Amino acid sequence: FYNVRANGKTNEEELFANLEPFFEALNLVRFEYVEKDIDLDKVIQGAIRGMLKALDDPYTRYMDPQALKREQEDMFLGRFGGLGIIISIKDDQLTIISPIEDTPAYRAGIKAGDRIVEIDGKTTEGMGLDEAVNILRGDKGTEVTLGIKRENIEELLEITIIRDIIEIKAVKKEIMGKDDNIGYVRITTFNINTEPELEEVLNEFKKDSDIQGIILDLRNNPGGLLDSAIEVASKFIKDGPVVHIKDRDGIVASIESRGNKYPEWPLFVLINEGSASASEIVAGAVQDSGRGKLLGEKTFGKGVVQQVFNLYDGSGIAITTSEYFTPSERSINHIGIEPDILVEPAEDSEQDMQLNKAIQFLEE
């Protein structure tokens, strides 16, 4: 059960008094509404969604049993049918946090920060996150047309994308540089596989005595599990705080690095507007500790942590339970993290200017 706190103590009588108008309204619907055969589960779910929407927090949301199961499978299996985009609600608009690399959306030119204003000609105004995800998901080979508003472009962009099976590999690696001495690591998401996959890659780099520097690519990484972010940051930061987390009572917990066993290679971290949440924890820790340099563009600005609570019927509620701050106690939420070295992508070139710049710095 849940205790309800009022003025620092449990006050169930006050809670039930506040709920009386709700039960009155529910009974009026049950016994006075013109259609007798109403779907009571649907009505209750709508009431829960309305309650959470009143908090004006895009990250606190209700998930019906199907949506909760889907989210858990996405996080732990990393495989689903869809377009390959991570979306959220930002400024009351359906917003793409990031396209997932090597997916239909990525290949179609979808960009972080794009606003989805239409799906198959239907406006997304007032559309909830779960409703949008349900529409965008689908079988391989089916198509959907998105109406996109993009910054600095007046006209509506209509982009048709064919759905596919999206499989997310958390960590990718490559050896780069003219002397093959730069280790490139791309982290696409923070899930239960990220830390062991990164460990394997860094062990390979450690055995290769030629490696003289590391590029950690967090661009278009929308985040994921908090613990995974702490593990990743700890691979590069030997000691000291990785992140501070403040709860509703103002109590701050400082989470320290879990220590690292790797050489302190020169480090560049690539970031952009699609780097969010757990990515910002890692980027902030690297920047504040002085362990490396951030290169690219300002990050998304999601500095809050959600916890999922299961309800008895198999549904769940994701509730924002705390806010996080960088080791130097900077707030990130709605602000983002500025790079140490600003490098904007070349719009009219296939060259990866940010990656090339990081390689150039490491080769100097």
Predicted regions and their residues:
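Glycine-rich active-site/cofactor-binding loop and its immediate structural neighborhood
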Residues: L77-I119
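Cleft-lining beta-strand/loop regions that shape enzyme active-site pockets
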Residues: T95-S98, Y106-A112, D120-T123, G128-K302, ...
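Short acidic, Pro/Gly- and aromatic-enriched capping/linker segments at domain boundaries
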Residues: D313, A318-S322
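Conserved functional hotspot residues or short segments at active or partner-binding sites
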Residues: I332, D348, M353-E364
